[in-house]
């Protein structure tokens, strides 16, 4: 297979990934592959572009490094072109409502007829099968959080609250990435393709599993947090200092001992309620939990963030200032690791945003291209799989493909 023009880099160089999906979840998987060196083809509808394009800045991050193909993959010669593309594809990711592709005739079996080694990742809100009441429903971030039991655990004691920005989409996209790579590893051993069914609500069910285990195995459900503090453990969560907010985790034997000395509770150490060797203070079960919070609140309120960070570093207590977005760029850790970077858009502008993660030492990722325009690479991709100029123009004339104007 001849690859499309692009630099060779990263741990996934030589891999061809194709995705069909809009907005965030499915495309986030494609973004990860593209930043790690894979050749990633982004399929868009011919009649209307991905709705993410209406956003002024985010698409320049989420669609960088991609090749843009505008093709009607469900109709006539457009479908034939799509299946031809699948013959040279390693991983295909689609994000839709339930078994939407199967309903329109593109089943796993059809895809495997054209490429027996193909890894297929289906990403939907409620999965490829189940009850009709749910399977075909649309789903976005908040829907997946609400249905999974994740949302009800977040917020404050007075009201649940979804986690933003778009947590379920990103977790689901990352799940698609890792699952597809796991499947590809097996395919290269057996020569037999794989189909993966990723339900967003099940992804979030796993993300919310920590507190749920107490309910499933004991009938007790952890209460929601109060003012950003951990619902279980004192000294953990969000706290206010004299000049702003920090988060901290009071965990560890020596950490508790030294902190208690600072906040005036040394006399509680080695008591029946806080015996020697205590590593966590349970805010509900320990009768001194509320007192610990009261004393800690008072001590933190009397000190600046800088003073708290310095003292907690001496005590090996994990803590961090709650940074504002403007503070990120100048933070020395961000600067040292180049966590924020710049790249050129296709129209020559400079765009700034998060850099590639994680950092591969021997085969690093890179940003080699900004977001392509609608249909920008259609002709190049179709030529790559054997279509002539006349073939491409015929697809365009029938409204089955769009090329860049």
Swiss-Prot record:
Known pathway: Amine and polyamine metabolism; carnitine metabolism
Reaction(s) catalysed (UniProt annotation): crotonobetainyl-CoA + (R)-carnitine = crotonobetaine + (R)-carnitinyl-CoA; 4-(trimethylamino)butanoyl-CoA + (R)-carnitine = (R)-carnitinyl-CoA + 4-(trimethylamino)butanoate
Listed GO CC annotations: cytoplasm
Top class in the EC scheme: transferase
MF annotations from Gene Ontology: L-carnitine CoA-transferase activity
Swiss-Prot/TrEMBL GO biological process terms: carnitine metabolic process
Localisation: Cytoplasm
Keyword annotations: Cytoplasm, Transferase
InterPro entries: CoA-transferase_III, CoA-Trfase_CaiB, CoA-Trfase_fam_III, CoA-Trfase_III_dom3_sf, CoA-Trfase_III_dom_1_sf
Binding site for CoA: 97, 104
Pfam families: CoA_transf_3
EC number: 2.8.3.21
Record: active site: 169
NCBIfam families documented for this protein: PRK03525.1
HAMAP family xref list: CaiB
Described purpose of this protein according to its UniProt entry: Catalyzes the reversible transfer of the CoA moiety from gamma-butyrobetainyl-CoA to L-carnitine to generate L-carnitinyl-CoA and gamma-butyrobetaine. Is also able to catalyze the reversible transfer of the CoA moiety from gamma-butyrobetainyl-CoA or L-carnitinyl-CoA to crotonobetaine to generate crotonobetainyl-CoA.
Protein family according to the UniProt entry: Belongs to the CoA-transferase III family. CaiB subfamily.
Record-linked PANTHER family: L-CARNITINE COA-TRANSFERASE, SUCCINYL-COA--D-CITRAMALATE COA-TRANSFERASE
The protein's assembly and partners: Homodimer.
Protein name: L-carnitine CoA-transferase
